[in-house]
C-alpha cells in the first residue's frame, strides 16, 4: 500500500514544497492523522505521486496496487490557494452530500487510478474513496464497517470486506485487557470473527458477485515483535479461514473450537505464541433489573469442570447461573481432566442505589467502546486504569447523559463515578458534571453541578474520581450529565473533541 494523498507527512518532511503550506514539516513520532497532506493543486506533487507509483510497479509485479485514500483531512485544501485554483479549474462544486474538497480528493484518486491502469495494473482504495466520485475501476476495501462495501457492490465495484469492528486483529480478543498485551482498543473476539458473514444483506445475486471476500489486518503500532503478531493472529486466523470456506448454514462454532483445541498440539510443537481465551471460561454478567440481581452465566467449550469461589468460602462446582445482589468477589476457573487449571477469572462487585436499575442514555457511546451498552454503568463492576477493558464506556464529541430509574422514591445525597484520563490518547477529564432529579421522569431539576479545570498535559494516565455531594433529596429519577473538553492548542488532537470514559455510576 502506498497511501495517498494523506498519511504523507514523512514525504512532506523530505519534500516540503509538495505540501500546501510549504512547511517546515516533521515526521511524526506516533501514529495518527495529520492535517498536512499532499497539495492536490500542485502539479509537481501529482508528478511525485506518479513517480513513486511507477517505481513501485517496477519493483512489485502484483496485479493490484493499494493507493489508500483514507483519513485525508480537508483543512489545508480549504485554505490553500493552489487547491482552490484547481477546484475552480476543474469546475468542481460541492453539494448537499459532499464538499468541493471531497470532490478534489476524488480527482486525485481518479487520476492515480488511471495512471496505474495505464500500466496494466488495478488499484485498491479504502472506503473513503466513496466520498465524492469513485474512480471507475477501483476496488474498494471496506474498513469502516460493512456499509462501504455494500455501497460499492451496489455500484458494481469489486469489494474486499475488512471491517475494523470484526477483522482488525490488532484489536483486543479478551475483555480482560489488564491481562493482555496493550492494543489500540476495540474488541474482536474469535467468535465474532467466526460468525461474521462477508456478504451483506440486501444485495442481489448479481451484486453479491462483487464481494471478492474478507481480509483481516494486523496494524503494528502496538505490535513490536513477530511473537506478538502470532498471538494476535492465532486462533483468529483459523476462524477467518473457516468463515471464508463455509456457507452460513454449515458453521458450527462449538465444533470448530474443539477442532482448534486439537490444533494447539501443532502450535506447541512449533513453539508458536497463541491466545488461549476460547479454551478458558466465558463469564457473561448481565444485570436483571426487573429482579434486582446480577446474573452470572459461566460456560466452557472444552472438557473439564467449572469451579467457582465467592469471597473466601469453599470452592464449589458450578451447575447453574449465579445470582449476585450484594458486595462480593467471584473467582472461577476450569479444572481439566488432565489435572491442569485454566485461567483464574475474578470479578469484584460493589453495589450502590443505582446498581441493577433501569438506565437510559440520551447519547450512545462510540461503537468502538460501547461493549455491553448502558448496563456497564450499573452492573456493580468497576474499571481499572486500562480503558479498553470493557468496563468503560467511551463518548466522543458528545455528552454522557444518563438517566437512572431508582424504581421508587429514594433518598440520595451523593453521586460519584470515575473517569479514565489518558491525555496522549485524547481522553480527558470532564469539563463539567451536573446532577438532576425528577419524580416523573419528565420534569428534571438540577441539584448539583461542578466545573473542572483541564488536567495538565503531563498528567500521568490514571483514574480521575468525580464526586458530587448535596443535601439529601427524595427522588425516583437521577440524571447525570458529563460534558467533555475539546483538545486544546498544542495537543495532537487540537481542533477535535476529546474522549470521556466512565465506568460505574454510583448513587448513595
Language-model features and meaning:
Residues 2-10, 68-73, 127-129, 165:
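Short, solvent-exposed turn/loop segments enriched in Gly/Ser/Thr/Pro and often Arg
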Residues 8-47, 75-101:
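Aromatic- and acidic-residue-enriched carbohydrate-binding clefts of CAZyme catalytic domains
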Residues 50-54, 58-65, 69-141, 146-153, ...:
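Gly/Pro-rich turn-and-neighbor structural signature
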Residues 122-138, 143-294:
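Flexible, acidic glycine-rich loops studded with aromatic residues
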Residues 251, 257-401, 420, 429:
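Short, compositionally stereotyped local motifs that mark structural "simplifiers"
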Residues 315-319, 460-465:
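Short, solvent-exposed loop/turn segments in extracellular or other extracytoplasmic domains
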Residues 385-448, 462-508:
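Aromatic, loop-rich ligand-recognition surfaces of beta-strand-rich domains
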Residues 446-456:
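Solvent-exposed serine/threonine-rich low-complexity stretches and specific carbohydrate-binding patches
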Amino acid at each position: 500500500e502506498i497511501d495517498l494523498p494523506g498519511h504523507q507527512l514523512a514525504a512532506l518532511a523530505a519534500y516540503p514544497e509538495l505540501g500546501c503550506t510549504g512547511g517546515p514539516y516533521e515526521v511524526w513520532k506516533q501514529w495518527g492523522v495529520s492535517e498536512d497532506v499532499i497539495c492536490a493543486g500542485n502539479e509537481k506533487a501529482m508528478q511525485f505521486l506518479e513517480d513513486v507509483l511507477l517505481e513501485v510497479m517496477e519493483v512489485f509485479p502484483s496485479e493490484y496496487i493499494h493507493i489508500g485514500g483514507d483519513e485525508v483531512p480537508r483543512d489545508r485544501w480549504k485554505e490553500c490557494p493552489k487547491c482552490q485554483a484547481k477546484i475552480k479549474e476543474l469546475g468542481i462544486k460541492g453539494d448537499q452530500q459532499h464538499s468541493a474538497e471531497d470532490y478534489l480528493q476524488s480527482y486525485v484518486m481518479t487520476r492515480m487510478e488511471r495512471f496505474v491502469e495505464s500500466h496494466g495494473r488495478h488499484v485498491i482504495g479504502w472506503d473513503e474513496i466513496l466520498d465524492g466520485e469513485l474512480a471507475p475501476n477501483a476496488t474498494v476495501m471496506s474498513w469502516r464497517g460493512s456499509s462501504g462495501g455494500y455501497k460499492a457492490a451496489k455500484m458494481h465495484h469489486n469489494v474486499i470486506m475488512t471491517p475494523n469492528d470484526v477483522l482488525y486483529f490488532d484489536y483486543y480478543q479478551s475483555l480482560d485487557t489488564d491481562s493482555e498485551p496493550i492494543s489500540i482498543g476495540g474488541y474482536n473476539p474469535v467468535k465474532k470473527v467466526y460468525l461474521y458473514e462477508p456478504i451483506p444483506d440486501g444485495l442481489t445475486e448479481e451484486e453479491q458477485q462483487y464481494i471478492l471476500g474478507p481480509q483481516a489486518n494486523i496494524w503494528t503500532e502496538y505490535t513490536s515483535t513477530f511473537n506478538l503478531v502470532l498471538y494476535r493472529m492465532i486462533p483468529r486466523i483459523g476462524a477467518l479461514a473457516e468463515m471464508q470456506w463455509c456457507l452460513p448454514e454449515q458453521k458450527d462454532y462449538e465444533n470448530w473450537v474443539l477442532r482448534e483445541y486439537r490444533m494447539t498440539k501443532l502450535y506447541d510443537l512449533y513453539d508458536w505464541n497463541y491466545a488461549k481465551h476460547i479454551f478458558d471460561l466465558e463469564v457473561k454478567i448481565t444485570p436483571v433489573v426487573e429482579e434486582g440481581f446480577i446474573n452470572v452465566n459461566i460456560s466452557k467449550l472444552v472438557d473439564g469442570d467449572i469451579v467457582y469461589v465467592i469471597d473466601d468460602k469453599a470452592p464449589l462446582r458450578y451447575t447453574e447461573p449465579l445470582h449476585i445482589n450484594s458486595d462480593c468477589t467471584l473467582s472461577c476457573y476450569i479444572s481439566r481432566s488432565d489435572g491442569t487449571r485454566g485461567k483464574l477469572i475474578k470479578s469484584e462487585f460493589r453495589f450502590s442505589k443505582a446498581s441493577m436499575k433501569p438506565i437510559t442514555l440520551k447519547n450512545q457511546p462510540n461503537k468502538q467502546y460501547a461493549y455491553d451498552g448502558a448496563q456497564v454503568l450499573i452492573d456493580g463492576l468497576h474499571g481499572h486504569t486500562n480503558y479498553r477493558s470493557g468496563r468503560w464506556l467511551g463518548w466522543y464529541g458528545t455528552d454522557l447523559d444518563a438517566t437512572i430509574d431508582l424504581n421508587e422514591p429514594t433518598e440520595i445525597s451523593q453521586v460519584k463515578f470515575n473517569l479514565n484520563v489518558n491525555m496522549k490518547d485524547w481522553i480527558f477529564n470532564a469539563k463539567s458534571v451536573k446532577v438532576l432529579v425528577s419524580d416523573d421522569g419528565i420534569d428534571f431539576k438540577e441539584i448539583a453541578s461542578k466545573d473542572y479545570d483541564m488536567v495538565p498535559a503531563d498528567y500521568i494516565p490514571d483514574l480521575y474520581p468525580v464526586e458530587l455531594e448535596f443535601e439529601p433529596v427524595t427522588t425516583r429519577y437521577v440524571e447525570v450529565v458529563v460534558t467533555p473538553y475539546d483538545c486544546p492548542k498544542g495537543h495532537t488532537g487540537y481542533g477535535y473533541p476529546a474522549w470521556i470514559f466512565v465506568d460505574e455510576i454510583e448513587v448513595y
